[in-house]
Amino acid sequence: PSASIHLGEIVEVLKEVLEIKGRTVSERLNHESLLNIFKIGTSAGGARPKILLSESKSDGSIVPGDINYSGDYEHYLVKLNVDDDLDYSREMIEYAYYLASTRCGIVMMDSKLIENRHFATKRFDRIAGEKRHILTASGLTGWDFKDPANSSYENLFDLALFLRIPHSEIEELFRRMVFNVVFANNDDHLKNHSFVYDRLSDSWGLSPAYDITYSLNPLMNFKRTSRALSINNKRTDIGLEDIRQIARKYTIRSYASVIEEVQSNIAYWRISASELGIPSRIIDSISRDFVFLQ
């Protein structure tokens, strides 16, 4: 059960580390051993600090994520909410996106909210105690994920074809693209798409989706935003014809039903977000950025 993972003490220590880091210029942090124990996945000053945890399947006890990789544990990446000043968290928003994504048929690892504030997702690089070989699109190709020249969905689809992944996974990638457009996940860069190598079959496959969420601050009004990955040479004002062009190029015959299914879950996302306790003003702000493909 989700209550079996207790992160309160870790969060308090992390807050202390963040405070010390904020006051430190050149002095070496004396919390280095702590950070190593909990395997903080981003810098402690990052906007969304992460830790790796392993939860015992038998009694719910937890250990740091680098201690036990056995099949007796569930292995999680946890995005911690350390901001007590807001009446919602970005982690709650990401969980609402997770619920909508999976309802739309997108393949993701099982995820949950811990104490209604921390987002925990099972790791796909550890399955039944086995380490899996994962590379991002950026890591496979050397493409700089910040460079617009390489950042396109067409490049991502072409890479998938080069890796000879099954056509069903090409269709899955298309579904993710449509979801990201409709639900305004603009931060869908090349590091947010990965591939898994299966050594037994000597083949590559598409990894489960991850980092699908609303990436902007819903409390701010943005006049114009652009996508990390272009579609049909466009980063803004993506329309139905742009999606059709991708569908034709990569033989996605069911594109119309995919679009319909994704768009039909906008109401579900709003209901889920409300049930999670996300304020209506935040739900309305995010929803205004959604794109209805016509």
Residue ranges and their predicted role:
Residues 1-190, 194-294:
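Phosphate/dinucleotide-binding and metal-coordinating scaffold of catalytic cores
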